[in-house]
Swiss-Prot record:
Record's subunit section: Homododecamer.
Protein name: 3-dehydroquinate dehydratase
Pathway: Metabolic intermediate biosynthesis; chorismate biosynthesis; chorismate from D-erythrose 4-phosphate and phosphoenolpyruvate: step 3/7
Organism of origin: Prochlorococcus marinus (strain MIT 9515)
EC code(s) of this entry: 4.2.1.10
Length: 146
């Protein structure tokens, strides 16, 4: 089973960017933690981060034939990107939407997501644990889908 983790803009700054909201772990720390979980479950996990919308769309499209599930924290693109939404829909790859903070308890503009209604699930507000919860969730979903 192949799972793709996508992180959007500014998530490369985790560990230094607003640690009171996002915590002190770096993106590399998160990816290492998830890779350990994936290895224990005999899952192939590919991690990808980009600050560029088109690169994220390209990555989704390039994954159509070899990825069974996607975890995505689209960052600010969650609230703005119809092209990422369309790429996810067009790929037909099941995906879980992730957020470190609870986007529904923040500023008004963060409460709208272009992804939520197409995701198999959303995990928001559990800090860095949102990533591992999402990974466990998509693994179970894919196992039960077979």
């Amino acid at each position: 089973m192949n799972i793709l983790l996508i992180n959007g803009p500014n998530l490369n700054l985790l560990g230094t960017r607003e640690p009171e909201i996002y915590g002190s772990k770096t993106l590399n720390d998160i990816e290492n933690d998830l890779s350990s979980i994936a290895n224990d479950k005999i899952i192939n996990l590919e991690c990808f981060q980009s600050n560029h919308e088109g690169e994220i769309v390209d990555k989704i499209q390039d994954s159509i034939k070899n990825v069974q599930g996607i975890l995505i924290n689209a960052g600010a693109f969650t609230h703005t990107s119809i092209s990422i939404r369309d790429a996810l829909i067009g790929s037909k790859i099941p995906f879980v939407e992730l957020h470190i903070s609870n986007i529904f308890s923040r500023e008004e503009f963060r409460k709208e997501s272009f992804l939520t209604d197409k995701a198999i699930g959303i995990i928001s507000g559990f800090g860095i644990s949102s990533y591992s919860l999402g990974l466990y969730g998509i693994i179970e979903y894919l196992k039960n889908k077979k």
